[in-house]
Amino acid sequence: MKLNRIFPILTACALFILPSCLGGNENPSDYSEWRVLNQNYYDSIEIATIDGILQYIPITPVWDNSFTVLMHWHNDPEENTSAITPLSTSTCHVKYTLTNIVGDTLDSSDSFQCVPNNMVTGFMAAITNMRVNDTVTAVIPYTAGYGAYGYSSIPPYTTLIFGIRLDSISKLM
């Protein structure tokens, strides 16, 4: 008899407790701390200097002024002015590594072919501001990445940190 009374109580508890233990809830509000950490990281990179010189150049695309990508060139862009710059519809060949703010590698490729306007908007802004043979680190805010819902194993509100080398452009369209 006592078991008959306990079973409904245990069932009700399991319905409320188990889902929170399984971690399957992708509600963006569950990521408020991660969002703050990512925003703080982006803000700190935006003002990072060495000897008073900004380490990242803010790039705000003319076609969308709602976000800014922070870019650090690992080569001297002034020595590469004769190289071509891709358009948003060009076919580009790049090497890249994608990490998050804690250094976890999320994706990488030694040979990736892409059309910039088929990528997240922050990647498109970065690649269309590069020239062939440029190597950059591009810090992309979540608003120009995978947004408030994330993508695959990338959580919502993730600042994307791309290491990109633009190897070539096969179709400049």
Language-model region placement:
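Cross-family detector of peptidyl-prolyl cis-trans isomerase
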Residues: 2-3, 21-173
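Sec-dependent bacterial lipoprotein signal peptides
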Residues: 1-21
